[in-house]
Structure formats: C-alpha cells, structure tokens
C-alpha cells in the first residue's frame, strides 16, 4: 500500500533518525576524516528546523550504508503515521508478562495466525464456552424442576 509522502514531516523524521544514530555512536557521514565528519554532524544539528537543508545534507554527507536503513525507517514511520489516523488501523499496545506473551505466541503459532488474531480467537472461544456453560446450567435446572414436579 502506498502512503502519501509529506516532505516537511519526513525531513523531520530523517533528521531525528540521523541524530539518534549519531548519538548511539554510529557513523552517519561518508567522510573518513573525523574532523570532516564532526563538521558535517554539527551542520546537521543546525538544520533541525530546515527540512530542505536536511535533504541537501543527506545527499552531500550521509553514509551510503545508512541510505537503505533510513529509507526503511521512513517507510515504516510513514505507514504508522497514516495508520494512526484511523481507529481500525491504529496500533494499540498492551503490557504482557513474558510468560503470558510466550503462551500467546505459542498458541498463535499453533493456529497459524498473528497475536491479535489469536487473542480474538481465544476471546470468542471463551465467550462460546461461557454460553455453553449457561445452557447446560439452564438445562440442569429445568430437568431438576421437571423431576421434582413429577413426584
């Protein structure tokens, strides 16, 4: 699925991605000389609010090894951004203990589905089981009434 590209927004994401990688200690520039790399990074840091400048910096200074990773990160961010606009595509998060997640993951693998589908399946099964239990209880009550009325 294609998502609309919003240049200013995505430039901000690119700037954040590059600064994050730099802070993590990764080499984000194509420069071998550390002084050139430092100058390029300082120039990048000054471009926070200049989207077109970020694109220019990327074409002039970014490490080629980082190009594919940056594109993937921006594609994922774009998808999350547009999916967050609609309730049915927005991702929700829940906290699970590791052992619970592990059991859920195993069940999802057995069913051959996603974790979300497995949760949905388990909830519907629990609902069906509860309904069947109520039906059995009602039948027992009706049967005991019939038997007690006969005497």
From Swiss-Prot:
Where this protein primarily resides, as one coarse class? cytoplasm
> Any idea what this protein is called?
Macrodomain Ter protein
Q: How does it assemble?
A: Homodimer.
Phylogenetic placement of the source organism: Bacteria, Pseudomonadati, Pseudomonadota, Gammaproteobacteria, Vibrionales
Q: Provide GO CC annotations from the record.
A: cytoplasm
Family membership, please give it.
Belongs to the MatP family.
Family matches, as InterPro entries: Arc_rbn_hlx_hlx, MatP, MatP_C, MatP_N, MatP_N_sf
| Alphabetical UniProt keywords | Cell cycle, Cell division, Cytoplasm, DNA-binding
Q: Which GO terms describe its biological process?
A: cell division; regulation of DNA-templated transcription
Q: What does this protein do?
A: Required for spatial organization of the terminus region of the chromosome (Ter macrodomain) during the cell cycle. Prevents early segregation of duplicated Ter macrodomains during cell division. Binds specifically to matS, which is a 13 bp signature motif repeated within the Ter macrodomain.
Its subcellular locations are:
Cytoplasm
Molecular function (Gene Ontology), one example: sequence-specific DNA binding
């Amino acid at each position: 699925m294609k998502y609309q590209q919003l240049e200013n927004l995505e430039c901000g994401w690119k700037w954040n991605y590059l600064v994050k990688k730099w802070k993590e200690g990764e080499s984000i520039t194509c420069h071998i000389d550390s002084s050139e790399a430092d100058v390029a990074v300082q120039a990048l840091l000054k471009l926070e609010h200049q989207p077109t400048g970020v694109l220019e910096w990327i074409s002039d200074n970014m490490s080629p090894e980082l190009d594919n990773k940056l594109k993937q990160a921006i594609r994922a961010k774009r998808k999350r951004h547009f999916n967050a606009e609609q309730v049915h595509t927005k991702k929700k998060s829940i906290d699970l203990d590791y052992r619970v997640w592990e059991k859920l993951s195993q069940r999802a693998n057995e069913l051959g589905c996603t974790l979300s589908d497995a949760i949905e399946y388990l909830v519907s099964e629990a609902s069906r089981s509860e309904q069947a239990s109520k039906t059995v209880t009602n039948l027992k009550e009706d049967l005991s009434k019939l038997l007690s009325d006969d005497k």
